[in-house]
């Protein structure tokens, strides 16, 4: 990762024909971290320096596209409005340039002379971060930054914070004095961070700077700055600026969207046709397609007109503007993707007659699934091969990425691009589906509905509190079906982590829950190998799965935090859980789709006072 050159150096990044300048390397991160942790717009600390990761604008050539391989996932690309995705540049060993970064924050302090000012006023050498008045003492980037819920980012206004009571000369930062920052050492609180100025104003501490209205009370408004985008003009912004710690997770949260590669897009043919797809779409007859393929794929028999016709038909079927999809009402395009995956997981895709390039193999177990009937579990499916693409759509600041609307998502580029950063993982898993008639009968119980309604109310309140406009807050997805399946997936992952040798962090859940779906996929997937070697798939055999379910449900009947856990009216963040804690139902957050909320193990096993709320009560009493 490399910062921009000094101001006086001649930079030709804006010229698409000009080569990228060779700049000093500042560090390296894993490819997956460029999507989940250090993506576009995030702050990254390298040694004693701090940078913001540049955007993906093609005109500014911030990303080395020749080092960012193209990956295809047609269904997800169509929903996100791009043509394809790109892997982030490779690691330090193989990358020549990588991703560029820009220095941020720009305000620094010197630990020796305690001077606090913009970095240019220290007059450091090119690409250095030192105080020239203190024998090249390394400078310390500001611990505090300012952000708003629309994603804007700026330096903390130290001048206005210090001169709050002397606005005549200090509001514009022209008092003529020299500011300094020191630490009293009395405590680790903000009260020990002291700001002073040689102009004589009373010194102040940073205490109170994190209050929601601390900056607006001083007349500070968001300037709409986007330092991760080169040349981005300041936007008009109505959001209130907030003070944040530079290393806080609230400074940057990714908005990730993912999809599984399923037939007919999973056999590698779509990748071969990517450059020709727009042309193939324009043809209206099979004969035109055959003539074009003979010229474009001379000598390649794997690309047939029948296969192309099948892909074109599938694309029309998946079109969100189709009448069948329009009738779905408020169903989001991402939920449509889940429904397509659910249908394919239920129907399967056998290994026979499939080539080595097939990325989705899903088959039923050979043994009799009758042993699972007491659990209300339909025939499981063994996903022996899968590929998932996870794309970075945008990012948010301050607001939770799941509770904020798209209007608060910060863009990755100044101008629209035809690609997005993404990573692909491959692995295997087990798909479990519950009998919907059993679920519907169980969900009609007033006791079950009351427990879930309390979760839903608390979750709705939390989403409204986090949203800038409560009217725009998303609606909680909590339903008896979702909470049950979500909790069951958690206890099953915990069981496999104890019995099958997989750490819980190596397994992930993928939920399929609405009025038309009732299942979940538990899978393991990695970006640097072809997944595991059948260890997860083996857990899906009916005999093993029945043993694991029985053991997991037995464990769920008792928690080391009981009776407090099972009797809790609410628990978790915002009261969005009931009987669930880290000792019984919670997972590492990388394994959970809902950040460990909307969980209630009482819906699995019941409570001592009312066993009837448990979906699996009959199995446990048998």
Q: Over which residues does each language-model region extend?
A:
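Extended charged low-complexity segments that act as oligomerization/scaffolding linkers
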Residues: 183, 187, 193-196, 201-209
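Extended, well-ordered protein cores
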Residues: 2-162, 178-184, 191, 219, ...
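Covalent nucleotidyltransferase core used to form phosphodiester bonds in nucleic acids
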Residues: 162-173
């Amino acid at each position: 990762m490399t910062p921009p050159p000094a101001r006086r150096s001649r930079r030709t990044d804006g010229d698409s024909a000009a080569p990228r300048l060779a700049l000093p390397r500042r560090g390296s991160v894993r490819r997956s971290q460029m999507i989940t942790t250090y993506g576009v717009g995030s702050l990254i600390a390298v040694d004693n320096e701090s940078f913001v990761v540049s955007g993906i604008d093609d005109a500014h050539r911030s990303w080395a596209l020749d080092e960012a391989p193209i990956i295809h996932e047609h269904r997800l690309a169509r929903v996100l409005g791009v043509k394809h995705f790109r892997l982030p540049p490779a690691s330090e060993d193989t990358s020549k340039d990588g991703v560029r970064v820009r220095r941020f924050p720009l305000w620094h302090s010197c630990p020796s002379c305690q001077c606090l000012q913009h970095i240019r006023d220290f007059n450091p050498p090119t690409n250095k971060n030192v105080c020239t008045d203190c024998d090249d003492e390394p400078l310390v980037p500001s611990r505090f930054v300012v952000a708003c819920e629309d994603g804007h980012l700026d330096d903390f206004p130290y001048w206005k914070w210090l001169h709050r009571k002397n606005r005549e000369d200090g509001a514009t930062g022209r008092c003529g004095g020299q500011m300094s920052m020191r630490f009293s050492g009395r405590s680790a609180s903000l009260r020990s961070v002291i700001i002073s100025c040689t102009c004589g104003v009373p010194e102040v501490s940073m205490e109170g700077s994190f209050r929601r209205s601390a900056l607006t009370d001083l007349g500070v408004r968001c300037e709409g700055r986007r330092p991760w985008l080169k040349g981005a003009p300041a936007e008009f912004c109505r959001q209130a600026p907030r003070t944040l710690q530079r290393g806080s997770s609230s400074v940057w949260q990714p908005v990730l969207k993912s999809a599984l590669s399923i037939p007919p897009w999973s056999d590698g043919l779509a990748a071969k046709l990517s450059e020709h797809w727009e042309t193939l779409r324009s043809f209206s007859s099979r004969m035109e397609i055959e003539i074009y393929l003979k010229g474009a794929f001379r000598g390649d028999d794997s690309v047939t007109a029948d296969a192309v016709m099948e892909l074109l038909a599938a694309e029309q079927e998946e079109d969100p503007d189709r009448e069948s999809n329009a009738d779905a009402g408020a169903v989001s395009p991402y939920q449509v993707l889940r429904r397509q995956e659910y249908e394919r997981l239920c129907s399967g895709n056998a290994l026979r007659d499939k080539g080595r390039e097939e990325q989705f193999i899903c088959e039923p177990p050979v043994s009799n699934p009758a042993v699972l009937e007491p659990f209300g579990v339909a025939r499981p499916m063994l996903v022996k091969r899968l590929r998932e693409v996870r794309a970075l759509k945008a990012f948010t600041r301050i607001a939770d990425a799941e509770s904020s609307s798209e209007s608060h998502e910060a863009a990755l580029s100044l101008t629209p691009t035809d690609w997005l950063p993404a990573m692909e993982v491959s692995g295997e898993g087990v798909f479990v589906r519950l009998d919907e008639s059993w679920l519907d009968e169980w969900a009609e119980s007033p006791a079950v509905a009351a427990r879930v309604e309390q979760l839903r109310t608390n979750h709705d309140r939390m989403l409204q509190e986090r949203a800038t406009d409560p009217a725009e807050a998303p609606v909680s997805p909590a339903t008896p079906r979702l909470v049950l399946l979500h909790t069951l997936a958690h206890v099953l992952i915990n069981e496999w982590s104890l019995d099958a040798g997989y750490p819980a962090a190596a397994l992930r859940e993928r939920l399929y829950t609405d009025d038309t779906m009732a299942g979940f996929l538990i899978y393991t997937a990695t970006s640097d190998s072809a997944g595991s070697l059948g260890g997860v798939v083996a857990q899906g055999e009916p005999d093993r799965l029945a043993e694991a379910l029985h053991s997991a449900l037995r464990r769920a009947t008792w928690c080391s935090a009981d009776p407090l856990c099972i009797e809790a009216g609410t628990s978790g963040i915002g009261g969005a859980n009931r009987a669930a804690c880290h000792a019984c139902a919670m997972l590492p957050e990388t394994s959970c789709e809902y950040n460990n909320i909307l969980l209630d193990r009482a819906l699995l096993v019941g409570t001592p006072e009312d066993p009837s709320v448990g979906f699996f009560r009959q199995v446990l009493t048998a």
